[in-house]
Amino acid sequence: TYRIAAVEQLRTYANILDIPMRVIYDADEMKNVREELNGYDVVLIDTAGRSHKNREQRDDIERLILSVPEEEREIYLVLSVTTKYRDLLKITETYSQISDFRLVFTKLDETASLGNILNIRMATGAYLSYATFGQNVPDDISRTDAQLIAKQLLGGNE
């Protein structure tokens, strides 16, 4: 973790939801946490946003992902729809070397240009899962609505 107050923000959400929360700093700690949370159906792992260009940071994320057995993991790659297409391609290419993933697009409220959602979906073959459109948690996150995105791509619903 390196974002200021990120852990406290997650702890606040965990308290609101009345669920346990653990903080780990490397993949070596994952085994103990997995054993501790073994009775839960779902364990969410939130990693800090990292640059795909930084090899050390990519390696850290890869070790963390690979510390969870493949049959137990479902990876969501979170991308801003405002990021340039070429950069989105590089990001998805980098992380596709680590694991399969589903896509979450953020900041739909900050742009009228949603073409990158379709472009990246087609380039990666990854499933579109969620989208965010504001700062209000959890109100501004929803499952991806393909019909709404198609309508906006075609110039409607602005």
Located regions from the model:
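Cytosolic-facing regulatory segments adjacent to core modules
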Residues: R22-R34
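Short, surface-exposed amphipathic charged segments that create phosphate/polyanion-binding patches used
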Residues: E35-G39, N119, S142-I149
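Conserved beta-strand/loop subsegment of P-loop NTPase cores
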Residues: I45, E71-L79, S96-F133, P138
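Conserved ATPase-coupling elements of RecA-like P-loop NTPase cores
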Residues: A6-V7, H52-R58, D87-L89, S113-N116
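P-loop NTPase switch/communication element
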Residues: T1-I24
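Conserved phosphate-handling catalytic cores of large alpha/beta enzymes
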Residues: S129, F133-E158
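Conserved nucleotide-binding/hydrolysis micro-motifs of P-loop NTPases
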Residues: T1-I4, D28-E29, G49-H52, V81-Y85, ...
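Inter-motif core of Ras-like GTPase G domains
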Residues: E35-I45, Q57-T82
